[in-house]
């Protein structure tokens, strides 16, 4: 595809896509080799997600994670959390489920069929054919596995197939793990937006990343190669 510069007229078929994409993304199930993304259901998923994100020991099959610092491993750079009780997490997830311009998906491990994390399409702007991947977190049982790599690949493949031109990834500028992950997966760094938010009583500067539709074929090949040479999930080591 052509690289578009400022002022470049867009083809009629590109402009027409804006009329076909809803503000709230349609529910969808995306299935990969190790993980599947399904619309999050509080009754089905919330209790298990809470049990795997509150700092208490986790056991999943033969894999075990000892007690860990949930704030450090999961919640430090997110808008809310950690959550002492299930009700708090459920309220947080419900806001994402009902967001008028987003879609909340549960990351499920296919081998066990159980939840290990949450990903979202957020800030959907069909008028400009752009969308963001955000509010992403994983239980320590799924960290240092293929979960984020495969989930991100599935999310990107889906929206570029729908005709989006731009997918964004934003994170706290201090979140070095997220910034490193974005670059590894082929997002391009665009800069830092200073004083973007006040979160949990502190200033947040935001690092911006993106992939454009004409870049996607190259990025998809990169992600496919990464998945092919990454070994299947091993027992994770907590990083408390």
Indicate residue ranges for each PLM-predicted region.
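GNAT-family acyltransferases
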Residues: 2-145, 158, 162, 202-240
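Conserved beta-strand-loop-alpha-helix junction that forms the acyl-donor binding cleft
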Residues: 169-179
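Flexible ATP-lid and adjacent glycine-rich G1/G2 motifs of the Bergerat
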Residues: 155
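Conserved GNAT acetyl-CoA-binding A-motif
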Residues: 161-170
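Short, conserved glycine- and acidic-residue-centered signature motifs
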Residues: 148
């Amino acid at each position: 595809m052509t690289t578009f510069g400022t002022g470049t007229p867009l083809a009629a078929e590109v402009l027409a896509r804006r009329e076909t994409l809803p503000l709230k993304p349609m529910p969808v199930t995306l299935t990969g080799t190790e993980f599947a993304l399904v619309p999050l259901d509080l009754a089905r998923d919330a209790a298990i997600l809470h049990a795997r994100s509150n700092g208490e020991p986790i056991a999943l099959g033969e894999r075990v994670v000892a007690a860990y610092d949930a704030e450090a491993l999961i919640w430090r750079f997110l808008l809310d959390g950690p959550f002492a009780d299930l009700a708090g997490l459920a309220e947080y997830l419900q806001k994402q489920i009902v967001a008028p311009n987003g879609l909340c998906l549960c990351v499920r491990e296919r081998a066990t069929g159980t939840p290990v994390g949450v990903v979202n399409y957020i800030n959907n702007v069909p008028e400009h054919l752009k969308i963001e991947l955000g509010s992403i977190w994983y239980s320590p049982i799924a960290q240092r596995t293929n979960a984020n790599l495969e989930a991100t690949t599935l999310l990107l493949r889906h929206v570029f197939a729908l005709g989006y031109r731009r997918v964004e990834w934003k994170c706290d500028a201090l979140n070095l793990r997220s910034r490193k992950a974005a670059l590894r997966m082929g997002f391009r760094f665009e800069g830092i937006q200073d004083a973007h938010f006040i979160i949990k009583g502190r200033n947040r500067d935001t690092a911006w990343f993106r992939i454009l539709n004409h870049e996607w074929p190259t990025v998809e090949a990169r992600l496919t190669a990464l998945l092919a040479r990454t070994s299947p999930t091993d027992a994770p080591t907590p990083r408390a």
